[in-house]
Amino acid sequence: MLDLAQGRSVAPEALDGSRFHWICAKLVRSKPVAEPLMEMVEVDGLQIAYERAGSGPALVLLHSYVGDGPTTWRRQLDGLSDEFTVVAWDAPGAGRSTDPPERFGLDAYADCLAGFLDKLGLDSAHVAGLSFGGILALALQRRHSDTSSALILASAYAGWAGSLPPDVAEQRLRQALALADGTPEAFVGALLPTMFSKTMPRETMDDFRASMEEFHPRGFRAMAQASAEDVRDLLPRIDVPTLLVYGDRDVRAPLTVAKALQTAISGSRLVLLPDAGHVCNVEAPNEFNGAVREFLHDSHS
């Protein structure tokens, strides 16, 4: 693992002395917790599905524009619920949630998320987002800044237009909109290979593939269009503790994207997970969970 908070490289076994070992071991030997609970809540006429597990400070998990919440975050629902109330939602147009209306942009997603948190009685929560979920976490901070006590941005962008060269951002949106009109097989075939490193175990990849095959065309289209926005203006104004986590084999959000966010967000901490791709929380769950746990301990001690 590389901890670039101070511009230095640190091996996982050396991170904060023996503390990283203690954190990862805790994931294995922690006290038993209840099975995740599947629930549904209505927000502004939309049925929003989610799973939650554990007790303690709230940790809300936002998935990418492919897959669903429980599949994307299973290892965090299991691995962090000994200490946190972990909530993984299905965004409108994903998983078991209903599709959004037409012209449902990034601000609408952020407002829906704020309404979701309100329905759950969460005045403030640690908010973690993967890829599109990271963009959504930033949009939530921009429109409802009092809802996030800490941000964890994994494989995230300041929107595609805010983090990628213009031609790359435009091509990515064109591809996504074309895939939304195609078959599930074409959708999975085009995107799944870009989500993981070449060393990803087939069994784990197959689980993620199954969730991708159940994609909602309208929801995927809405999330792709929301992902294409530019939220760079927010970054210098972020005033909550922020952790950036990226896989060092990520071909979708490369290190240049990570470093640009670290530079723009004052006091942010950047951790690289070795040999992990875009869905780094799935590919390196123990390292990801350890980094999150340590960050939340440090930022609220």
Predicted regions and their residues:
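Short beta-strand/loop motif that positions the catalytic acidic residue
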Residues: 238, 244-246
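Catalytic active-site module of serine/aspartate enzymes centered on a nucleophile-bearing elbow/loop
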Residues: 268-301
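Gly/Ala-rich beta-loop-alpha elbow adjacent to hydrolase catalytic centers
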Residues: 129, 133, 137
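Active-site loop/oxyanion-hole signature of alpha/beta-hydrolase fold enzymes
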Residues: 74, 78, 87-128, 290
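Acidic catalytic loop of the alpha/beta-hydrolase fold
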Residues: 248-253
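Flexible "cap/lid" loop of the alpha/beta hydrolase fold
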Residues: 138, 142-143, 148-180
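Conserved HGGG/HGGXW glycine-rich cap/lid loop of the alpha/beta-hydrolase fold
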Residues: 43-98
